[in-house]
Amino acid sequence: VRALVGDLTFLHDVGGLLLGELEDEVDVQVVVADDAGGAIFALLGHEEANPAGFARLFTTPQRADIAALAAGYGAAYRRVTTLDELSRALAEPIRGRSVLHAPVGPRRQEFSRAQALI
């Protein structure tokens, strides 16, 4: 199983990586498209009216350590910084719990290109 989430969604739901003591290991990979906040909300068209308020209330920039969070829940971690690296990582089989961290920047076109690969 592979799931594509944004960084804010990952931060909200990271506890889902926790595996109970009586549970068998599962093969699941969470691909984190990290735009350092909720850039998807730029699609709402409200940014121009109040850029500072929009950033604080909608994009909510953050500096979370995604690698440390993955490790804390016992999941493997890998960071990819190019579309080629992402493409190669996605071609590999999923074994166990893992987090594939793909910083995509705040620009929608970067996110769209990464999303097309997944």
Kindly label every feature range from the protein language model:
Residues V1-I118:
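Thiamine diphosphate
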